């Protein structure tokens, strides 16, 4: 059964989103911060239905005072339904990512800094995009004119917790499709009782009579191929459903048809190359795109990516134009029309229908882009790219042996994740070592002078350092590592990595400078200083203190206390009129 596309999505009237909840639970909460806890997890919940006259229609948005622009509503409507080529019968779960438009969102605001400062870079809140997690149902229904019930429940968030939100949808959506609005209102009120996601904490999240236990990853976690085990310290009834990860997908299942090309795909992701993933359905396309963008961890994926993208998207023309080079984006699509539209793209991955048998599916072949001409193009990785590194045959043998021995898929995924993690770390460690060498020595940081500058990153110097401190120290793979680094320097990921590391080093430098000031004899320094110099010191110390207290500087609490004491001491030494200016009542 095809999902038809109408003239365009429009707002359908009525429904839960039409009025604000007035339940007693809602009334009991603080008026100044409505939906504060809910908004720590989700932006809103949307229901998209198919209307014979309107096409895809936004039936409701909840909470009702969350503001979506018309363009965002249109995008959600189209992205919430599989296109007509997918033929998804039954229940389908997938995800999408769309650009935010400007304008005020809601009556509440979530401060991202506290979470982002502690979260792994790859799991920080999206600053400019929404992530949509979709549960779509299409089943025969004789009571409907078209003969089919077609509806999607969409969780809109800025958190990339795909595993958590998919699990949440699998609980909520079937119940919602049966009971509709009252069920959704109750669920949203339950989420509004959840504690905020705090990196490093294990949380128990009650929903519809079930407790989901999750651990929010932290930036200081030891990188492993599998997440830390959950620990339940409370005697919870009912016993919690433990999610081993809020974000990790089943990598082995996602990569099954392309295992022989995992390293080539890893290189393409590392270099930020434009890639189209053409899959038979949005669940396959979105999972594969998310798997590809996650295979660089702990590196943050700095390019654009769209797990599911349609020809109706408001950015369709922008991303498919032939007037300029293809953008650095990974597109997940299901409409074969994209093969013709994106023929000029350098890399196209065509995936066939998934086969869930125990055997390894037929691997897609590497093919030249010139063979990508017809709408019935066969599965394959169409690219003229030649991998810099040799294929790890030992990994493929281990995975194949696991298939033959019917090894659990989560174990297979752990093997694959560890391989990709070690590969990325082997590539990044030399960069980290070289970057660390650019940091000024601590002995050169003196309290009464501006801290020294970080030395510039010189690519030639780095490449020369690889001879004795390169990836060969931690990785057995042979190949043209130098060539890979040279191309990496031109990619968005080098720029993103360098900016982040430089920012962290600059903050560390400033923190060390603050510590040096706090350890100095400030009274001895003030003896021969003018009032202007003393006031200047107060202002600079205050600025550093404000930045440090805003978690922007890595300093200890004792240093902050000492800095405040120094400020008070310095101000106390000034004339009364200046004290009044610096410390107004």
Swiss-Prot record:
Listed GO MF terms: guanyl-nucleotide exchange factor activity
Sequence segments annotated as region (Disordered): 1-25
GO cellular component entries: recycling endosome
Segments forming domain uDENN: 43-221
Pfam families cross-referenced by the UniProt entry: DENN
Coiled coil location: none
Residue ranges constituting the dDENN domain according to the UniProt record: 375-499
Location (main, coarse): other
Residues in cDENN domain copies: 246-373
InterPro entries for this protein: cDENN_dom (IPR001194), DENND6 (IPR024224), Tripartite_DENN (IPR037516)
Keywords, sorted A to Z: Cytoplasm, Endosome, Guanine-nucleotide releasing factor
Subcellular location(s) of the protein: Recycling endosome; Cytoplasm
Disulfide bonds, paired cysteine numbers: none
Record field: compositional bias (Low complexity): 1-10
Family membership noted in the UniProt record: Belongs to the DENND6 family.
PANTHER family, alphabetized: LD41638P, PROTEIN DENND6B
Function: Guanine nucleotide exchange factor (GEF) for RAB14. Also has some, lesser GEF activity towards RAB35.
Name of the protein this chain belongs to: Protein DENND6B
The species this protein was found in: Mus musculus (Mouse)
Gene designation per UniProt: Dennd6b
